[in-house]
Swiss-Prot record:
GO biological-process terms attached to the record: cutin biosynthetic process; fatty acid metabolic process; wax biosynthetic process
Natural source organism: Arabidopsis thaliana
Cofactor: Mg(2+)
Region annotation Fatty acid-binding: where it falls in the sequence: 492-516
Reactions accelerated catalytically: a long-chain fatty acid + ATP + CoA = a long-chain fatty acyl-CoA + AMP + diphosphate
Chain positions recorded as ATP binding sites: 225-236
EC supergroup of this enzyme: ligase
Family: Belongs to the ATP-dependent AMP-binding enzyme family.
Tissue expression per record: Epidermal-specific expression along the entire stem. In cauline leaves, was expressed over the entire leaf surface, most strongly in trichomes and guard cells, but not in mesophyll cells. In flowers, the expression was detected in the stigma and filaments of the stamens, and in the carpel was expressed specifically in ovaries. In roots, was expressed in primary and lateral roots, but not in the root tips.
Protein name in UniProt: Long chain acyl-CoA synthetase 1
Keyword Lipid metabolism: yes
GO molecular function: ATP binding; long-chain fatty acid-CoA ligase activity; very long-chain fatty acid-CoA ligase activity
GO cellular component, one term: endoplasmic reticulum
Amino acid sequence: MKSFAAKVEEGVKGIDGKPSVGPVYRNLLSEKGFPPIDSEITTAWDIFSKSVEKFPDNNMLGWRRIVDEKVGPYMWKTYKEVYEEVLQIGSALRAAGAEPGSRVGIYGVNCPQWIIAMEACAAHTLICVPLYDTLGSGAVDYIVEHAEIDFVFVQDTKIKGLLEPDCKCAKRLKAIVSFTNVSDELSHKASEIGVKTYSWIDFLHMGREKPEDTNPPKAFNICTIMYTSGTSGDPKGVVLTHQAVATFVVGMDLYMDQFEDKMTHDDVYLSFLPLAHILDRMNEEYFFRKGASVGYYHGNLNVLRDDIQELKPTYLAGVPRVFERIHEGIQKALQELNPRRRFIFNALYKHKLAWLNRGYSHSKASPMADFIAFRKIRDKLGGRIRLLVSGGAPLSPEIEEFLRVTCCCFVVQGYGLTETLGGTALGFPDEMCMLGTVGIPAVYNEIRLEEVSEMGYDPLGENPAGEICIRGQCMFSGYYKNPELTEEVMKDGWFHTGDIGEILPNGVLKIIDRKKNLIKLSQGEYVALEHLENIFGQNSVVQDIWVYGDSFKSMLVAVVVPNPETVNRWAKDLGFTKPFEELCSFPELKEHIISELKSTAEKNKLRKFEYIKAVTVETKPFDVERDLVTATLKNRRNNLLKYYQVQIDEMYRKLASKKI
C-alpha cells in the first residue's frame, strides 16, 4: 500500500492517568527534518515586497465597480501600483501617530483597500487586527477594547455603526479611515468624541505629503491578531507572528510544487470568504508569494456566479456549504434534462469515475466524457478552473467525488484552524483514496492523535483514532491576554484541536468526530452535536440543521430548515399545491423530515440515542444578520438556543407527554 505520510515517532501507552498518544506523522517532504526556510522570506512583508520586485507589472488586486446598480468588468492594480499605495498608506499611519506595535483594525468586506491596509501594517511593524464585516456592535466593542486598537480602516457603510451610542469603543480610536469616503455628518459626529476621520484619497494624500521610510518587522514580531468568530462566548484573539505566516507560505509552495500542474504567476484566485478568516487570508498570502492575481467578489454571495463568469478564476477555495450549493445547482439542472440525456450523463459519470479509481489523472481519465458532458459544468465555473479546495468543515465524500468527476479540475479537502494558520493538512490531487479525508500533515507541522477515553477513541487501537494534536513551526503564539486558555489547549508542546481524527493505514487523516460541543445526555451517553449536524445535513431534505440536547434530557431534537426544491417535489408527489412557507407548517412534512433523518441515521450506523426524536420546521435559513451563524456559516449554538428556546421547550414537552 502506498504511504502518503512519514511516521517519525512511535505511539506511547498511557500510564498514571495520562492518555495514550499515537505515532507522530509528518509530510514526506519533512521525513528527515523540516526543510530549511528560505532566508529571503521570513516575514509577511518579505512575501509581498519580493513579489513586487519580481512581478511589478502583474495584476495583483482586482475589483468590480458598481455604477447605477450595474456591476462593471474587473479593474486591476498591478503589484507596483499596490506597492506605491502601501507606502503612502503606511506613511499616513505613521503621520497619524502609529508606532511599531500599534494595533490597526480592518473592518469591512474583501477589497483592494483591505489588503493595502494590511500590507501597510506589515511595512511598519504594526499589528493588523481583522474584524469580520458581519460583526455586531457588541463583538466590535469587545475586539477593539481587548486588542487596544488605535486606528481602524472601515468600509464606508460600517462607519455609522461604529459611531452609534451602543458602540462604545469609538472613543478610544485615534482615527477612522474609510475604504472610500466619509460624509460630513459622520466626520462631525466623530470629531465630537475626538476621533479623526479620513477618506481613502485624503489618507493617500497625507502619506504623499509626509513620507516615512518603511520599518519592516523581524520574524519574531506579531503580524496579526485574528479573532475567531466563535460559536459561543467572546472571540479569542489568536496571535500569529510574521515567522509563522512566512513559514506557512513557504511550506505551501513546497507542497504545491510536487505536482505536475503547478500554481504560477498566471493563476487567478476569486476571494469571497471573509479576509478575517484564516483560510482566505493565507490563500491570498500564498498567491502574493507566486506573483499571481486575486479578484474580489462584488459583495453579494447570491450572485457569486456572475463574478465567477467575469473573473474566470483558476483557483476557488470555500467552506463545504459553498460546494454543496454548487452540487445542488448541478443536480437541479440534471433533473431538468430529458431521461435520455440524463442516462448519458450518468453513464459517462460512471465511466470516468472507474478510470479515476484506476489511478488516472482527472485530465486523462476520460477526455471524451469531459468533452461531451463535463466541460459544460467547468464552463459554469468560468472555464479555467484548475483547483477547488474545501476547508472549514468536512466535505461529504459523495460531493467531493461528484466534483472530482464533473468539474474537470483538482479537488482536495484541507483541514486546519486559525491557531495553525489554516492549512494543517491537505489532500493530494487525483488520489481517489483520499476521498472523504483531509490529507496529510503540512510541510512544517506534525500530527498525532491522543486518547479520548470517554468517547471510546484509542490512538493505539485497531482503528487508530483520537483527538488531533498539532506541533510545529506554523503555529500560533498563544491567545492574546489569555494565558489560562493558552495553557489549556497547549500541553507538552502540542496544540489540542478538539477535533477527533482517524489515521488510515496509508497515513492519511480523516475527521470523524468532534470533542468540542460534546454533551452528555441524561442516560450518561456522550453525543457530538456538530458531528451529527454534518451527517444529517447530507440528507437532501435538509438545507440547515441545528441539533440540540443537554444533560437533563435523554433525547435529541432539532430545528430544520428544509430544502425548498426537495419539499416542493415531495408536495407535488402528494398532491399538495401550497407555497413553501405554508407547506412548512404541515404536520405531514414534519413527519417526513423525521423519517428522512431516521433513514440517514440508519445509513450512517448511528446509535439509537443519536436519532432525532422531534423537529421544528423553520422556513428561513440560519443567517449572519440574526447572529445565528458565524461568517463561515457555522452554527452559533448559544444564540440559536436563545432564538429557539420556546420551540425547544415545546418539543421536549410533547415528547414527555408521549411517554406518559
